[in-house]
Each structure stands twice: as C-alpha cells, then as structure tokens.
C-alpha cells in the first residue's frame, strides 16, 4: 500500500518499493535497537504540524490498529485450525 501511494505520486514502482521497504526496515530497527515502546518512538519522530503526524492521524482515523489486530487474530485462528 505504501509503495502504491509512492507510484501514485510519481515514483517508479522500484523506487516506491525501495523507499517503502527502507521505511519499514528503519522503523523495525529503531524498535529493536533502542528498547523504547513504539508509542514513545512515534512521539519522538512526529514534529508538531509535520508530515509524519499527519500520516499517523490518518492511520488512526481509518482504524489501522484495529485492522492490524484483526489480521493477527485471523492468522492465529488459521494457524490453530491448520495445526489440528
């Protein structure tokens, strides 16, 4: 989805995939390396009135947390089903 948005705004598919992967990898590395809760990290990287907080607000408005939790629950349920 992130890469598709990049293409929408003029990046090539490869550029968009690379940037999206780097963003995800960078976020994961930050969580793994510093030991801070992701909420604290979010607070650290979001500037007042900035682009990141605008994106975070949009994710929250559109139910991102619930969508991710639902997907994890579906994965666990399917894994349980497959293990029987």
What is the role of each PLM region?
Residues 1-18:
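Anionic-ligand binding region
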Residues 17-84:
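NAD(P)-dependent Rossmann-like dehydrogenase/reductase catalytic/cofactor-binding core
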């Amino acid at each position: 989805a992130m890469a598709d948005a990049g293409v929408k705004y003029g990046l090539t598919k490869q550029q968009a995939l690379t940037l999206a992967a780097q963003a995800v990898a960078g976020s994961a590395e930050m969580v793994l390396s510093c030991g801070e809760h992701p909420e604290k990290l979010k607070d650290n990287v979001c500037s007042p009135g900035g682009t990141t907080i605008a994106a975070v607000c949009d994710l929250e408005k559109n139910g991102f947390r619930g969508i991710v939790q639902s997907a994890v629950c579906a994965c666990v349920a399917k894994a349980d089903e497959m293990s029987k």
